[in-house]
């Protein structure tokens, strides 16, 4: 397994397994949105109203889209871990 794959696989697998919506930006600037249905060494299958096979060499960035529940959980995490300063 290539060293780069060790970062990609867990990241993409979490997005796929938890069905987190993603925005995929291509190197030509096009933005695609959907859910990662599957992936391998060379391609990602993106599912929205249709399935699209996207070659990884054409991808610039993969961005998870946060849902309200995820934002709420992050807000709770930040509030619970905030530093309390004493006068």
From Swiss-Prot:
Pfam family, one: Hfq
PROSITE patterns: SM (PS52002)
Coiled coil: none
InterPro entries (UniProt xref): Hfq (IPR005001), LSM_dom_sf (IPR010920), Sm (IPR047575)
Xref: CDD domains: Hfq
One MF annotation (Gene Ontology) recorded for this entry: RNA binding
Keywords: RNA-binding, Stress response
Family membership: Belongs to the Hfq family.
Functional summary from the UniProt entry: RNA chaperone that binds small regulatory RNA (sRNAs) and mRNAs to facilitate mRNA translational regulation in response to envelope stress, environmental stress and changes in metabolite concentrations. Also binds with high specificity to tRNAs.
Name the record gives this protein: RNA-binding protein Hfq
Gene name, Swiss-Prot/TrEMBL: hfq
């Amino acid at each position: 397994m290539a060293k780069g794959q060790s970062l990609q696989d867990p990241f993409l697998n979490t997005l796929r397994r938890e069905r987190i919506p993603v925005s995929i930006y291509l190197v030509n600037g096009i933005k695609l949105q959907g859910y990662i249905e599957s992936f391998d060494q060379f391609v990602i299958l993106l599912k929205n109203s249709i399935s699209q096979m996207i070659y990884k060499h054409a991808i610039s960035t993969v961005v998870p889209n946060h849902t309200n529940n995820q934002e709420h959980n992050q807000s709770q995490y930040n509030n619970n871990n905030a530093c309390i300063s004493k006068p």
